[in-house]
Amino acid sequence: KNNISFSIFKIEILLCLSSLVYTENLILDNQTLTLHGAHTYEVISLQNNSSIFVDSTTCKLLLYCDSLFIDSSSGIYANSISMNQNSMGSNFTDVGAGGAGGGYANLGGNGGGEVESSGGLTSGHLDSLSTGSIGGKGDIQLTAEDHMGGRGGGAVMVVSHSAKIYGEISANGGPGDDYYASGGTSIWDHGGSGGGSGGHIILNILHLEMYDGSLLSVRGGNGGIPFEGENAGEPVIPGGGGGGSGGY
């Protein structure tokens, strides 16, 4: 059964690739490029500290090509760009409470403090190209502009005949803000914000070679650090933000 399923999968990729019309190559040599949406190339080559960054317009990048090469100093990055709120970690308005981490492949981490804020729920699917969710804010007693939750990771899909990956493809969630570092008062105790969840990477590649040092990463962002204020009479123990869930 597994062999049959894998054969069907290979046929689906071949049918997809056979319908593509390759018009140009994308060769980056010590260069940086920002992309979003779907793009088709015959050859994609990233070398000598080259980077493709996925921008926040759609937070998604789909690459169709005959061959892909990424050297050990180069990569494709969709880190901390998504404002998706589908599985957002909950905000918390009490003084000292930490915001919860965004959910995706798993639950986001709960925010710390005397009362925990709940982590974002599991969402998305292994075969669905979705972006990660943002983390919740820490206590929002002052201004909503402070202590934001981390953004979620974006989404990257590569459909290719062959690929050699020595470098990195990542869609990591961003860290939640540390409260005091983002402009909080030094008097009161304040919680950190939740980390964003990791995003999604899909590689539909017939002949894939990955080497020592190569990396596929969809980790969630760390929760923000709380701040214990100077007011000795404040009975609150501040909590850190929850970590974001990993992605797929």
List the model feature ranges, each with a label.
Residues 57-60, 66-248:
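Glycine-centric low-complexity/flexibility signal
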